[in-house]
């Protein structure tokens, strides 16, 4: 793409003068700019609380159609390997915007909505591309929220600004084809063509093959403990564009805005909530998958939930000890001893299900876990409160 200089800023040829990153001052740093103020500068309407919901949805739908129709055709189809360069990331930004918009989602710390970014996109895109290519782009903060976990306690999620989610999604589209072909087939989480259903099907097959004991490994706060240095080294094995590696490093180290407004540094971990996080978690645990394969184990992994199937309790305890040493020594992660166990598959839930062997036939049936049953009943009560009150 030919470029020309304008006030020491890189401007794509034929593009409009780039606007600064929404929510940031020039160079991607400084005080936040209110969304309403940015919209006035751009002379574009945005979604506000005063807009009727129906009108906002129609305008968003129409804007999506306009952007989709005007988007350039990808040089390489999404899902196919392309050079892992910043140019490829910049080229995929509009595709990434459409993906992020389809997922909806809440605003990040800067308060910008997806609807607002859609309206501003023609003016935002040239400047965003220029900042990425020049290495100037600085991600904003990550809004920390906590949601209840099915087993009790809370799970922390990190919600990036909408524009950062677009950049993360474009980066994911470039990186995923480089790793996807070499990920282990027993890894099922957040991968094309795989799901909870394929994971349960493989686990069921292992039990049917006579592996009637389960080594249930619980990685304690996995997403919060990922070592940035080890992850960076893994990425550098397949990505040679230093600008892209630096960008990913900035995403990982983006400051976290806690619910009480306190801002904290982020020196380790991969915050859950961004489009890039699931892929990076699989890159981290791919080494674990191939170590399990090297040792000849039957296993299934879905994100940070791993189950190894063995033929006896004694073998399971031996495997548990060996894998704990590998995880904590090599991967620098931690096994939660209180939640990990060697047990029969019917006594451990996996993705909301249990596997039980029918003694008379030797076949394996898939059952809802007790926790899933309770959650389902609670949901039914919430959806039909009057019915339950009448009883």
PLM regions with names:
Residues 94-97, 106-154:
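Phosphate/adenylate-binding "loop-and-lid" substructures adjacent to NTP/NAD/dNTP-binding pockets
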Residues 1-122:
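Non-catalytic, polymerase-adjacent accessory regions of viral genome-replication enzymes
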Residues 162-170, 204, 232:
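Duplex nucleic acid-engaging cores and interfaces of nucleic-acid transaction enzymes
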Residues 61-73, 88-105, 142-144, 172-178, ...:
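Short, compositionally biased low-complexity segments
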Residues 156-161, 366:
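Conserved phosphate-binding loops in nucleotide/dinucleotide-binding enzymes
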């Amino acid at each position: 793409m030919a470029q020309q200089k304008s006030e020491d800023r890189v401007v794509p040829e034929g593009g409009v003068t780039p606007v600064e990153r929404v929510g940031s001052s020039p160079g991607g740093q400084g005080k936040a700019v209110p969304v309403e103020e940015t919209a006035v500068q751009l002379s574009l309407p945005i979604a506000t609380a005063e807009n009727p919901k129906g009108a906002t949805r129609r305008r968003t739908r129409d804007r999506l159609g306009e952007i989709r129709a005007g988007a350039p055709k990808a040089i390489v189809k999404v899902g196919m390997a392309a050079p892992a360069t910043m140019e490829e990331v910049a080229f995929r930004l509009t595709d990434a915007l459409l993906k992020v918009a389809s997922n909806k989602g809440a605003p990040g710390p800067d308060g910008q909505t997806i609807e607002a970014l859609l309206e501003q996109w023609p003016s935002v895109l040239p400047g965003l591309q220029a900042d990425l290519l020049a290495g100037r782009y600085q991600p904003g903060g990550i809004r920390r929220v906590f949601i209840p976990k099915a087993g009790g306690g809370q799970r922390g999620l990190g919600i990036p600004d909408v524009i950062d989610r677009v950049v993360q999604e474009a980066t994911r589209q470039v990186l995923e084809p480089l790793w996807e072909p070499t990920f282990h087939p027993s890894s099922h989480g957040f991968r094309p063509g795989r799901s909870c259903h394929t994971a349960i099907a493989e686990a069921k097959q292992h039990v049917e093959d006579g592996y009637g004991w389960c080594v249930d490994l619980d990685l304690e706060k996995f997403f919060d403990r990922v070592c940035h240095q080890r992850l960076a080294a893994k990425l550098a094995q397949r990505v040679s564009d230093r600008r892209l590696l630096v960008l990913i490093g900035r995403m990982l180290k983006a400051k976290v805005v806690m619910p009480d407004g306190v801002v904290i540094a982020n020196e380790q971990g991969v915050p859950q909530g961004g489009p890039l996080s699931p892929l990076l978690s699989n890159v981290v645990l791919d080494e674990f998958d191939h170590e399990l394969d090297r040792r000849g184990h039957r296993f299934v992994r879905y994100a940070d939930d791993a189950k190894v199937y063995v033929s006896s309790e004694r073998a399971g305890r031996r495997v548990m000890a060996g894998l704990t040493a590998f995880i904590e020594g090599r991967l620098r992660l931690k096994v939660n001893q209180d939640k990990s166990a060697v047990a029969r598959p019917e006594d451990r839930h996996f993705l909301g299900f249990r596997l039980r062997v029918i003694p008379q036939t030797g076949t394996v049936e898939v059952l809802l876990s007790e926790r899933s049953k309770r959650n389902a009943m609670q949901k039914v009560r919430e959806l039909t409160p009057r019915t339950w009150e009448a009883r």
